[in-house]
Amino acid sequence: MARYDRAITVFSPDGHLFQVEYAMEAVRKGNAAVGVRGTDTVVLGVEKKSTPKLQDSRSVRKIVNLDDHIALACAGLKADARVLVNKARIECQSHRLTVEDPVTVEYITRYIAGLQQKYTQSGGVRPFGLSTLIIGFDPHTGVPSLYQTDPSGTFSAWKANATGRNSNSTREFLEKNYKETSGQETVKLAIRALLEVVESGGKNIEVAVMTKEHGLKQLEEAEIDAIVAEIEAEKAAAEAAKRPHRRNLVELKFVLNYP
């Protein structure tokens, strides 16, 4: 097995490319990332580690612009992300200069996925150890989009999705709670999904909101804290509403069982 373990371009007898699977494992151990598409808004949210007092927090952003109308978040190896983001930005600008038109979200997603796939079958390189969530608005139709790519080079479109740490449980939460929303409700859903895996609340969450009119806006920590407080208040109100109902059920059972 060791031969197939080391070789990037050699399949194992049972059809595995182990280096690609190891890259996917790096994604599963990376920070949690969530993307949610609304009717007029697309939101990216990522888990972030608390920065030291002397570090400039702007230098460790995990959500970046590829173009004015496209943004990307990722889970996995950050150094790999920097290389991939730089290549994608160059492609966006090259396309704009060549055809005098901005790229579509699908076009740049195909480009990124193609790069990731190329690095699974080339000698002297290794697969990118990251999965990306790409959001944006079509420059011609104005329709919002959300795509995901993975280390194998696969890409797909989503209404809402998660990657990184505990992505399965986060995706299950999104499946249960997703509905077509707009504006602030889309932002709240993304933050609620992240709070399923981020224990320390809003201070360890980075959120960016994209609209067609204003492009990408990174939310300040105070704005995130306000939304988290609103979500917690809604949870407390829902729990309080359930308690009288439970008490009534207990009383009803007591009456029915009373001799």
From Swiss-Prot:
**Highest rank taxon of the organism:** Eukaryota
Q: Which InterPro entries match?
A: Ntn_hydrolases_N (IPR029055), Proteasome_alpha (IPR050115), Proteasome_alpha-type (IPR023332), Proteasome_asu_N (IPR000426), Proteasome_sua/b (IPR001353)
Keyword Cell wall biogenesis/degradation present in the record's keywords: the answer is: no
Enumerate the UniProt keywords alphabetically: Cytoplasm, Nucleus, Proteasome
Compartments in which it is found: Cytoplasm; Nucleus
Q: Where in the chain are disulfide-linked cysteines found?
A: none
Read off the SMART domains from this record.
Proteasome_A_N
Entry GO CC: cytoplasm; nucleus; proteasome core complex, alpha-subunit complex
Q: Which Pfam family, an example, fits this chain? A: Proteasome
- Give the UniProt record's GO annotations in the biological process aspect: proteasome-mediated ubiquitin-dependent protein catabolic process
Instruction: Using the UniProt record, give the first listed, main subcellular location.
Output: cytoplasm
Say if the entry is tagged with keyword tRNA-binding.
Answer: no
Q: How does it assemble?
A: The 26S proteasome consists of a 20S proteasome core and two 19S regulatory subunits. The 20S proteasome core is composed of 28 subunits that are arranged in four stacked rings, resulting in a barrel-shaped structure. The two end rings are each formed by seven alpha subunits, and the two central rings are each formed by seven beta subunits. The catalytic chamber with the active sites is on the inside of the barrel.
Task: Provide the function of this protein.
Answer: The proteasome is a multicatalytic proteinase complex which is characterized by its ability to cleave peptides with Arg, Phe, Tyr, Leu, and Glu adjacent to the leaving group at neutral or slightly basic pH. The proteasome has an ATP-dependent proteolytic activity.
Q: Which NCBIfam families match?
A: PRK03996.1
Identification of the protein by name? Proteasome subunit alpha type-7
Q: State the organism of origin.
A: Solanum lycopersicum
